[in-house]
Structures are given as C-alpha cells and as structure tokens.
Amino acid sequence: MKRNVIFWVGIKNENHNDKYGDFKYFEYTKATWKHFCKRFDCEFVEFNEPLQKDLTEYRVNWQKAIYAFDVIESLGIDYDQIALVDSTCMYKWDAPNFFELTDHKFVGWRDFDNMNWIYQSIQGYKPFFNDFKLNMTNYINSGFIIFNEAHRETMQSFKELYENNKQVFMQLQDVIVKKGNDQTPLNYWLQINNVDVKTDLPMAYKLTHMHRRDLFKYNWQLNVDQTPYFIKYGYNWIFNGIPKHERSQVIEQLWNFIKHNYE
C-alpha cells in the first residue's frame, strides 16, 4: 500500500556553525513531524547525511531538491505523495493533514516575503534559462513543497540540469546573483516544463517571517487568552528571518511550552 512521505531535511553543515548558531533546534522541529507521521500513518524519512560530501559544490538546499526521489526509492518505500520539509519548519500538534488537500498536484506556497530579493534573483538567473519569462506571481518558496510520482521525471531532469551545469550555478549563486540556491532555478524549471503547481492552499500551512507579521504577539486588548497568534491560527511554523544565532533558543523555548501536546 502506497504511503505519504515526510522527507525531513536535517543535514548539519558543521562549517556553518558560526553562521547558524548550532543546529540544536533540529531535535525539536523533527519531533513535530514524527508526530505528524504517527497521526496520519505516513513514512518519516530523515535526510541527515548528504549524498555528496562537498557541501560547497553540492549545497544542502540543492541536495534536498535533486536527491529526494533517490533517497526515498533507495529505502524501498512504496510512496504516494512526498512533502519536502526544511528543518526550520514545525507542525502544530492538532493541525489538519495537508496531503488531503493537494488534488495530487505539485504544491507550493507563493513567496511574498521579499519581493525585491525575488525579482533580483529571477533576473539574475534569467540569462541561464534563455531569457524565459517567468511568471513572478506564481513564484514559490522551496522550503516546503509537496509532489508525487507524476513529478519524478521533472525533478530527476532538474538533478541532471544541476549536475551538468554545477560550476555555472555555483558562480551564479556565490558570485554573480547571490540570491538563493535551488529555489529560483526550481521555479524556472517548473514553469519551463509546464508543471501545474497548486498554490492556493491557505497560508496557515506555511507561516514565514512570523516576527515581521507580529505573529509572536497576542491580543493584549482582551487580555483573556495570551496564546500567540501563530499558535492559534497557524499550522506550519517556519522560523526564518530570525537572527540565525537566536533560532535555536527561540525554538527551544517554544518546544518547552508546547511539547506536552506531542506526547
């Protein structure tokens, strides 16, 4: 019987400890996704060892995108849908099963967090993709996406694209464009290959930059319920945009507050 898969990405690049302030938060975010799998009878696949050891030539963000099918198939899993989940994501203990909302399409969430960054990234990669006119309104974030076997060929060809042009991509991401790794190339590849991407799932399933949206606050005017907005109204909490050296501390504090719900 086919099962849905949570492909959780938790590779520790020790060379970036100073930049990211350690990876202690992995254990807390991972626990929420294991709980999800137990609730909804899904396979939990932990991608914690890179297939390519050179993390400069093969960034973690690239490896998660181009090797998801390879890793899952190597485990002999009879998979249905796959949710690729970054380690910065935490799922609420009683939130719904998003796999039931996909219509078996490729699912992503539109990225509006930094439109200038997105525009510059799109323009920077445009010459590589033969000046393809990418529809910016359908640009998605690659940190949480859902796909299935119907998208295997597209994702495997994306892997070939990178492996055949990795020196060019490294130059673009590290020297010329300096706006992301896999995300913008993946958006180009999905649109070039006419992949039908479902982008209308509620934002509750992907709350990003929560501090900028005041989601860590609560309704102080009523002063009845001090539950932060992101817990009350969100399902999938993404801890990005926070100073990276503070991320583990913030997530640990949250985990200590809510962990009893996952027992």
Language-model features, listed with the residues they occupy:
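Catalytic core and acceptor-binding pocket of nucleotide-sugar-dependent glycosyltransferases
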Residues: 66, 137-249
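Conserved beta-strand scaffold positions in the cores of enzyme catalytic domains, especially
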Residues: 44-46, 82-84, 106, 197-200, ...
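N-terminal anchoring/stem segment of glycosyltransferases
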Residues: 1-80, 256, 261-263
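Short amphipathic alpha-helical segments and helix-helix/interface helices
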Residues: 30-34, 68-69, 95-99, 186-187, ...
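Conserved beta-strand termini and adjacent loop/short-helix elements that scaffold enzyme active sites
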Residues: 9, 47-49, 109, 200-204
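Short, flexible, basic/aromatic active-site loop/helix in glycosyltransferases
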Residues: 122-136
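GT-A fold catalytic core of metal-dependent nucleotide-sugar glycosyltransferases
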Residues: 60-122, 146, 151-152
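Short catalytic/ligand-binding loop motif for oxyanion handling, primarily in non-cytosolic enzymes
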Residues: 15-16, 53-55, 91-94, 99-100, ...
